[in-house]
């Protein structure tokens, strides 16, 4: 399991910080895990899965 910090999440998704946190508040994006104190990171595989779900939705009829 690999943990990634916010800059990597932003690079992977193309989202900005505020968009990531807005989606988390809506339960539409993986939540980070707390490391030490205020430091947090995301599970890379969960972020990849979220991206793959967005790609799959693109191909679904509306």
Named regions from a protein language model:
Residues 26-32:
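Short, solvent-exposed alpha-helical "recognition" segments
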Residues 33-39:
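Short Lys/Arg-enriched helix C-cap and helix-to-coil transition segments
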Residues 2, 28, 38:
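Residue-level signal for beta-strand positions within conserved beta-sheet cores that form or flank
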Residues 40-46:
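C-terminal end-helix/capping segment
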Residues 56-62:
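C-terminal secondary-structure termini that scaffold catalytic or DNA-interacting sites
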């Amino acid at each position: 399991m690999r943990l990634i910090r916010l800059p990597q999440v932003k690079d992977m998704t193309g989202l900005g910080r505020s968009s990531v946190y807005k989606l988390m508040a809506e339960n539409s994006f993986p939540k980070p895990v707390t490391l030490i104190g205020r430091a947090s990171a995301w599970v890379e595989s969960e972020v990849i899965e979220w991206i793959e779900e967005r790609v799959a939705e693109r191909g679904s009829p509306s």
